[in-house]
Amino acid sequence: MKTLSKLVWPAVFAASALISINASAAPVSFTANTPTWSGAVGGSDYVYNAANGGFTDIRWGTPLSAPSGLGFNPTDTPFVANPNVAFKLGDLRHYNNPITAGTAATSVNLGLATTVADAAPANQNFSFQFLIDETTNQQPCKYPNSSTPPCDDRITFQNMTLNQFFTIAGINYTLALIGFSNDGGATTQSYFDSQEGGTNNIGLYARLTEATQVPEPGSLALLGLGLAGLVAISRRKQKSSGLAA
């Protein structure tokens, strides 16, 4: 029994170590990012997916001077993101122009078609919803610290594909927005207050999170062998104790 124990315990430790090694998260490389706007709610006069330099825009509203809207410019690819560390997904732009009441969007969807190196599946489509509160530009302003002229609009977001994951080296990952930032991601906040009467940019940050690990079959087999050996040893000890009694 001592000999078997000496053989089994190393097997268990080796299996555990192997699974631990397989579970070590590595940097993830994104090789393509293509944005698409869709699903606008409320308002009128939509123009979808207009190219504007590096930005892809959605515009809305009956303008007094120019339409309002949002634009997104994804981070240049290829780029690498480390799991559980905030990274810049791209820049969000708000065209905050005076438009006729009742013609503003209340929400729009942003789809991001990405290619993830060495992932299964490699091609991913992530979806995010942006909620837009276009204020009436009348004092008192709805949000504090509003600019002059009043009043700031507020943009928030929702992740729509939190249950979607891709797998690299036996580890499942999910991608989710975590906030807006103007300081390179040192701090993030869940909303973007956009100054009235201007074009305002802000960084949009996300995070890769490790989901349920998928151990490799060989690791599971080795661990199972070790556990089976321990059970056998335990049963033999129980039988020996019974005979001695």
Where do the PLM segments sit?
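Short, threonine-centered small-residue motifs that mark membrane-proximal processing/anchoring sites
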Residues: 4-28, 203-229
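C-terminal membrane-anchoring or membrane-association module
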Residues: 231-245
